[in-house]
Amino acid sequence: DSVMPFINHTPNEKGVYVLNRTSNPGGKDLQNLQVTDNEKRFPLYMEVARGIVNYNAGSGSVGAVVGATNIAELKDIAAFYADKSIPLLIPGVGSQGGTATEVLSVLRSVGYPVELARVNSSSSLTHPWKKAPVPEDWLERCEANLRSMIEDTKV
C-alpha cells in the first residue's frame, strides 16, 4: 500500500525508484536494523532490495536508490541486483564523499550491468566551492567538475 499506488499509476515506459539504502549518515539507524528470515540475519536494506525485485517482477518499472557513501553496502546490493535488471539511482557522489570511479569499479566487480546505473552528482556540479563564498571562476569550476564526472563515468 505504500509503493503500489505509484507503480500502478506509472505510465508506460516510465518508472519509479524506491529508497533502498540512502547515503545520509542517519540512514543506518533504521536501514541497517537486522531482520531474520528462516534463521538468517541480514540488514533491513537487503529485505527492501528483495521487495524491490518483487515489485519490478510485476511491472518492470521499479528501480532502487542506493547511496554511494557506503561502498560496501552498495557492493552487496549491486551484487544482489546483478542478474535482476534493477536500475540503480546512486546519489552521494561528489560533495557527499562518494566517487564515480569507485562506484563504477564496485558495480563492475560484482557483474552489475553499469548501463542500468544512474550516478548522481548534483551539488559538486552546481556549486563545487562548498559553503565558501561564490568564487569569480564559478562557471569554470562547474564545467571542470562536469567534465571530470563525464570522464569518470565513461562505460
What feature does the model see in each segment?
Residues 39-46, 71, 97, 136-143, ...:
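Electropositive phosphate-/nucleotide-binding environments in soluble metabolic enzymes
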Residues 103-112, 116, 125-155:
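C-terminal helical cap(s) of enzyme catalytic domains, especially alpha/beta-barrels
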Residues 7-11, 53-56, 77-82, 150, ...:
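Surface-exposed amphipathic alpha-helices with a cationic face
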Residues 69-120, 124, 128:
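A C-terminal functional module that forms or caps the active site or interfaces directly
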